Regions:
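Phosphate/pyrophosphate-binding loops at sites that engage ATP/ADP/AMP, CoA/4′-phosphopantetheine
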Residues: 18, 40-54, 61, 95-99, ...
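Short glycine-rich, Thr/Ser-proximal phosphate-binding strand/loop in the N-terminal lobe
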Residues: 2-40, 44, 73
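Short glycine-aspartate micro-motif
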Residues: 3-7, 51-55, 100, 124-128
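Glycine/Thr-rich phosphate-binding loops of Rossmann-like dinucleotide-binding domains
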Residues: 14, 64-66, 135
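Glycine-rich phosphate-binding loop and adjoining helix at the ATP-binding site
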Residues: 62-123
Length: 138
């Protein structure tokens, strides 16, 4: 099974294709620019790759509430051009596959809990230091 992943970071996007074992089969990164240019790079990477599902971890703030009318949006970010951008809408318009959306920190912590150093542990802490400092507790 081929799975797609996007780390939508404030300075760069990392896109990859992996499998259910957590193995990375293909990976690329590019600078975060205006949404149109950045998403063009995302689409260029994934088009024709026949991925079966896609996970997105994004810089924020975001709206991850499935019941919200702005689910899938990057909301009140100071990042130029990205304020109230419907990133999941753009992806769903292009790809008819199951998708998940959360913060970049939650995505990274979930990856560590599922495939990384926290796999099999009852508890773990994930600390990220960037524009802000976030501590994630499992």
């Amino acid at each position: 099974m081929k799975l797609g992943a996007i780390e939508a970071g404030g300075t760069k996007f990392v896109v990859c294709i992996g499998n259910e074992k957590g193995e990375v089969l293909e990976r690329e990164s590019f600078p975060t620019e205006a949404p149109e240019k950045t998403m063009e790079n995302v689409f260029k990477f994934f088009d024709g790759k026949e991925i079966e599902a896609l996970g997105v971890g994004s810089f924020g703030p975001i709206d991850p509430d499935l019941t919200s009318p702005t689910y899938g949006y990057i909301t009140t970010t100071p990042k130029p051009g990205w304020n109230n951008y419907n990133i999941m809408g753009a992806l769903k318009e292009r790809y008819d596959i199951p998708m998940a959306f959360d913060t970049d920190v939650n995505g990274a912590a979930l990856g560590e809990a599922t495939f990384g150093v926290a796999k099999g542990l009852d508890s773990a802490l994930y600390l990220t230091i960037g524009t802000i400092i976030i501590l994630w507790v499992l």
